[in-house]
């Protein structure tokens, strides 16, 4: 099976290096890496030695909660379509695959290459996606860590947010459409990737709809997929996520929690294909343990 592994990253981590080394051994795979424009691309020059690894020349400024993550993802999908593939995975630089590649390919064939994308449901807390797009958010929202002034600004925004209404949002809703939310990390078949890029190339209004929206990467593609009528979506309510990604948002102290040896058994028993996030110094031994059969 021809697969594309698309990575969004801002630093060269041990998990990223291990994933590139693992998947590049199969010459039918293509690995495409987007490096945040704020990062030093020279740190990633070692990946140029791999014949099936591409470092995107088109780089975006990825700010927490902003459209940069969506723009970077679109660039990855566009580059992927320049290559032959059956299936694509969107990953972070802190992800590790937790099955061997033969199992991965067999699983994808067994589900008829259905799309692995998670829409929020009873398995996770509900967040109203409309609030992400309904307003034009000022730049001080796009910070992962905020100071006292930012908190005051946000309070002021909540009091006067009616003045920042997104008119495109109301046009979309009044036409009978709705927004959907889920995890930004997904697996898509070739037809879905092609349909997404074709739609975006012909409908610039959809990008305008999300201008100055908040954390749009969890809404943009989920809503688009529903809007254009893609319905070959994998679903298994016995799994933690329909995207088959293992993430610990519960135990802390960081959210999501950095995974280690104590999580290996839980990850393997979850039935997930990938897990995140792993520490930057994660060992090869842990990676090997992850891919062993339960």
Residue ranges of predicted features:
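ER/Golgi luminal nucleotide-sugar-dependent glycosyltransferases, focusing on the catalytic module
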Residues: 1-294
């Amino acid at each position: 099976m021809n697969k594309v592994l698309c990575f969004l990253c801002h630093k060269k981590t041990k998990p990223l290096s291990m994933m590139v080394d693992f998947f590049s051994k199969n010459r039918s795979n293509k690995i495409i890496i987007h490096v945040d424009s704020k990062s030093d691309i020279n740190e990633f020059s070692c990946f140029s030695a791999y014949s099936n690894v591409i470092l995107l020349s088109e780089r975006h400024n990825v700010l927490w909660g902003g459209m940069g993550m969506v723009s970077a993802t679109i660039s990855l999908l566009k580059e992927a379509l320049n290559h032959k593939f059956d299936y694509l995975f969107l990953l972070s630089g802190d992800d590790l695959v937790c099955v061997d590649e033969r199992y991965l390919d067999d699983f994808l064939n067994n589900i008829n290459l259905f799309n692995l994308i998670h829409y929020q449901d009873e398995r996770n807390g509900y967040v109203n996606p409309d609030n992400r797009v309904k307003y034009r958010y000022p730049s001080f929202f796009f910070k992962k860590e905020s100071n006292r002034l930012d908190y005051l600004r946000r309070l002021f925004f909540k009091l006067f947010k009616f003045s920042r209404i997104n008119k495109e949002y109301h046009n979309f809703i009044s036409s009978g459409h709705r927004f959907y939310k889920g995890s930004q990390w997904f697996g898509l078949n070739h037809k879905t990737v092609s349909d997404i890029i074709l739609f975006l190339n012909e409908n610039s209004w959809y990008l305008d709809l999300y201008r100055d929206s908040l954390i749009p990467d969890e809404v943009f593609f989920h809503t688009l997929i529903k809007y254009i009528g893609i319905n070959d979506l994998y679903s298994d309510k016995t799994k933690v996520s329909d995207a088959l990604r293992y993430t610990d948002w519960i135990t802390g102290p960081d959210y999501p929690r950095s995974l280690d040896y104590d999580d290996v058994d839980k990850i393997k028993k979850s039935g997930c294909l990938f897990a995140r996030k792993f520490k930057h110094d994660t060992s090869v031994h842990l990676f090997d343990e992850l891919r062993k059969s339960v």
